[in-house]
């Protein structure tokens, strides 16, 4: 039998004991911080039905996920924690108390080319407030405050918190006449770090051109 050389797959993380202890301490700080602000821990399955994960992502998501079949089941590894959360709330909405405040710190998987800053397996540390209808604006303001205090607890001193609001983008797309294409435009912009500003600019101007208006500086 040929000898198998041990290796770690590209884009996957393995830590030596000392670093693993440090990492676990960081995760514990996150858990304590999130719990302190009234968020409940949640752990959703790493494997979901592929149709659930692909429900709103479209073709671009299909390119990113690890997908496989087991018997008659079409399955996939979760690529984020948001879609599993949506499924969880839809499934258990009659048993939950709203606003539902949850946190989840778990691994997610992306079937894309590994490169600097982009892994195939990595952790996400999410906090979300799910309302039964509309949420108070204080919930929006609370999240950056929690992030600030959590980063401070981790010992970070120099960091930026970038805030965005989907309503601002929706208003911009309405002005540009791109309401029906909003999802495609945002998925293109989301590739900024992956493919670079020049390619993003080319896609925006070639595929989503608006007469008399350039998207180059948006």
Where are the language model's segments positioned?
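Extended, charged alpha-beta segments that form solvent-exposed binding/catalytic grooves
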Residues: 2-216
């Amino acid at each position: 039998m040929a000898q198998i050389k041990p290796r770690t797959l590209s884009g996957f993380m393995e830590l030596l004991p000392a670093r693993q202890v440090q990492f676990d301490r960081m995760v514990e700080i996150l858990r304590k911080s999130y719990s302190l602000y009234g968020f409940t821990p949640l752990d959703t399955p790493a494997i979901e039905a592929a149709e659930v994960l692909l429900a709103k992502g479209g073709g671009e998501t299909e390119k990113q996920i690890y997908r496989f079949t087991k018997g008659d089941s079409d399955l996939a590894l979760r690529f984020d924690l948001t879609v599993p959360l949506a499924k969880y709330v839809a499934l258990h909405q009659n048993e939950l108390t709203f606003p539902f405040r949850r946190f989840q710190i778990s691994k997610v998987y992306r079937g894309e080319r590994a490169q600097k800053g982009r892994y195939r397996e990595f952790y996400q540390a999410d906090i979300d407030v799910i309302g039964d209808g509309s949420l108070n604006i204080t919930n929006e303001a609370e999240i950056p405050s929690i992030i600030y205090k959590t980063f401070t607890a981790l010992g970070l001193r120099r960091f930026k918190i970038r805030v965005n609001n989907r309503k601002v983008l929706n208003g911009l797309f309405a002005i540009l006449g791109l309401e029906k294409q909003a999802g495609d435009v945002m998925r293109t912009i989301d590739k900024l770090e992956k493919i670079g500003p020049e390619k993003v600019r080319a896609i925006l101007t070639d595929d989503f051109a608006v007469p008399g208006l350039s998207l180059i500086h948006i």
